[in-house]
Amino acid sequence: MPDAIPPAADDPTEAIIALERAALDRWGKGDPSGFLEICAPDVVYFDPSLERRIDGRDALARYYETLRGKVSIQRYELLNPLVQRVGAAAILTFNHVSYGGGTAEHRWNCTEVYRRSGGSWEIIQTHWSHTLAVRV
């Protein structure tokens, strides 16, 4: 089997997925600050439980404070991650499955748009939606 080709120096895939995983790890312990720390001041956020988009990190922080300490995820899977680079932006898409206590399972689709700013990547747009159940 041939050696794996190392990612190009300008390929943000590993860095962005690492940022996302670190934020998800904290989220699962009830700490939304991991996401706030990687969001740009002008981030926009869509959530299926909200009627409208949230504009700006300050507004997102106010919303996340209502959730602080209330999320408990025992483990999660970040499936099918794909990072597509477009200039100074990169789009991360993935499927997310979270497991709480017992057999509780929640399935999500996620799209995060990252922007390169000051040598680091920050989220400028985030969109979470429920994954439809598989029909048999």
Describe each model-derived feature in a short phrase.
Residues M1-L36, V44-V136:
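A beta-strand edge to alpha-helix "cap/lid" segment located at domain peripheries
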